[in-house]
């Protein structure tokens, strides 16, 4: 019975995290456009635009009124679901996933 309740808890946690996918991708898209515009204004290649995981997590925590831990879990879950590119301490939207 203990493992059953643990499975339910994990399932609920996954559902909670996945419910943030769409709003998180919107936030990421907005941050990405701002970064691209900044690079464009400075004359650099906008293909180099990326958002730090920390900035993305903090923005989600502020906008969605969630804690940093949950925001980090959302970032990791998005990467595991192959909805964002995660490299080093940076993330960026996958091409064609959310436009």
Located regions from the model:
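Short, cationic-aromatic polyanion-contact patches
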Residues: 54, 89-99
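Eukaryotic partner-binding/assembly regions in large regulatory complexes
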Residues: 1-4, 42-46, 66, 88
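Short acidic, hydrophobic short linear motifs in intrinsically disordered regions
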Residues: 40-59
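Long, low-complexity, charged/polar intrinsically disordered regions in eukaryotic proteins
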Residues: 1-36
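A short, conserved structural fragment
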Residues: 79-89
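Surface-exposed polar/charged interaction patches
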Residues: 31-34, 63, 81
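Short amphipathic alpha-helical interaction segments
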Residues: 65-77
């Amino acid at each position: 019975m203990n493992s059953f309740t643990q499975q339910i808890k994990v399932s609920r946690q996954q559902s909670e995290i996945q419910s943030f996918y769409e709003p998180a991708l919107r936030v990421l898209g907005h941050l990405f456009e701002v970064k691209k515009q900044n690079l464009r204004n400075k004359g650099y290649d906008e293909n180099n635009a990326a958002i730090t995981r920390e900035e993305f997590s903090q923005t989600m925590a502020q906008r969605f009124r969630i804690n940093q831990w949950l925001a980090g879990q959302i970032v990791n879950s998005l990467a595991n679901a192959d909805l964002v590119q995660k490299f080093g301490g940076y993330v960026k939207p996958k091409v064609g996933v959310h436009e």
